[in-house]
Design a protein with these regions (language model features):
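Active-site loop/oxyanion-hole signature of alpha/beta-hydrolase fold enzymes
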Residues: 95-139, 143, 317
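Catalytic histidine-centered segment of alpha/beta-hydrolase-like enzymes
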Residues: 280, 303-317
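Flexible "cap/lid" loop of the alpha/beta hydrolase fold
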Residues: 156-202
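Alpha/beta-hydrolase fold catalytic core
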Residues: 1-68, 90-92, 129, 320, ...
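Conserved alpha/beta-hydrolase catalytic His-Asp/Glu region
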Residues: 195-264
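Conserved HGGG/HGGXW glycine-rich cap/lid loop of the alpha/beta-hydrolase fold
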Residues: 58-106, 123
Length: 330
């Protein structure tokens, strides 16, 4: 092998191992914001519900304060709430829940959103939490809707639905006709294949995280371009760690989601958050969702699907205004 080829192989190897760094730098802004990380919790552990699903939870903040329960989105974990945790932890009791097959929760037994909502009701009973404010992002918002309209209807003070649709997720996103046409012949079989072959997809996910290819997709799927490189790598790393069979199972669960007939049953204050640059949940769908909620309000932000991280400083103030509104403090 010639010296030139050796240098090419070395360059390829370096790119495969560290490509995420230059790609994240090129795809991100230079804004000076605090890097996301892991904050210590006051207590943590696992709880198992009657469905057979086991959840990892972390609690933070003063334990006698108003509780806010955080439910993350698909292929994320409770770690996505870093900025919200730092902002709200001094004043509120915070509960961070990893969905089964995400973060530190083991694979789920049943990932239907109705089951996850019943599980949430059981978790609130186990933790002796009364009248929480439930804050759901994306998939977490779907569970929040099911909870507030059903098993948690008598044990919820308010809800926050951030970038979360009220019906089949492909109906409230970009290219709905194409995605719906591909769902049964392509996407569902693909997800079933991923569940059966997790080793291959875990390897693929790890390689794509290291070389930065997943950085590219996450930049356009989750952010508007004002995220920092550390934020982009942080979220991509969370996704790379999650078990692919768990993500596939959860994805199949939300493909059967529909709360359009139930949202009128939600009788508590609800803040619906949408974003101008969110390809996953269109702001127009948020307008309809708010119109169906008896106490709904709409906050539209100039951000992407992960505005809770990309523009956390501004968003946390807006969410805090809702949490401290007279409807929730009387």
């Amino acid at each position: 092998m010639t010296a030139k080829n050796q240098w090419k192989l070395l360059a390829l190897g370096l790119f495969m191992a560290f490509g995420r760094y230059p790609i994240s730098w090129l795809m991100s802004s230079n804004r000076k914001v605090r890097k996301p990380g892991i904050l210590p919790s006051k207590s943590r552990g696992h709880l198992t519900c009657s469905s057979g699903n086991t959840y990892y939870l972390e609690l933070d903040g003063p334990q006698d304060a108003q509780a806010i329960v955080f439910l993350h989105g698909l292929n994320a974990s409770g770690l996505q709430w870093y900025y919200q945790r730092a902002y709200f932890r001094k004043k509120y009791k915070l509960v961070f829940i990893d969905t089964p097959g995400h973060g530190k929760s083991p694979l789920g037994r049943n990932m239907a959103t109705e089951v996850l909502a019943r599980d949430l009701s059981e978790l609130m009973e186990m933790l002796a939490i009364r009248n929480p404010i439930v804050y759901g992002h994306s998939m977490g918002g779907m569970v929040t809707m099911k909870y507030a309209a059903g098993p948690g209807r008598d044990n919820v003070k308010g809800i926050i639905l951030q970038h979360s649709g009220f019906t089949h997720p492909f109906k409230t996103t970009q290219f709905p006709k194409t995605l719906l046409a591909l769902e049964h012949p392509v996407l569902r079989p693909y997800l079933a294949f991923a569940k059966r072959h997790p080793v291959f997809f875990r390897f693929l996910s790890t390689i794509n995280y290291l070389n930065g290819l997943s950085i590219l997709s996450y930049r356009y799927l989750l952010f508007s371009g004002e995220q920092t490189a550390s934020q982009l790598r942080f979220m991509t790393r969370i996704a790379a760690i999650n078990p692919p069979e768990g993500i596939a199972d959860a994805f199949l669960g939300i493909l059967d989601f529909d709360a359009s007939a139930e949202i009128k049953k939600i009788s508590v204050p609800a803040l619906v958050i949408s974003a101008d640059h969110d390809p996953i949940f269109l702001p127009e769908a948020a307008d309809y969702l708010v119109s169906q909620l008896s106490m709904g309000s709409h906050l539209r932000v100039d951000s992407g699907h992960l505005s809770l991280m990309e523009h956390a400083v501004e968003l946390n103030v807006m969410v805090n205004n809702f949490v401290e509104s007279p409807d929730l403090t009387d």
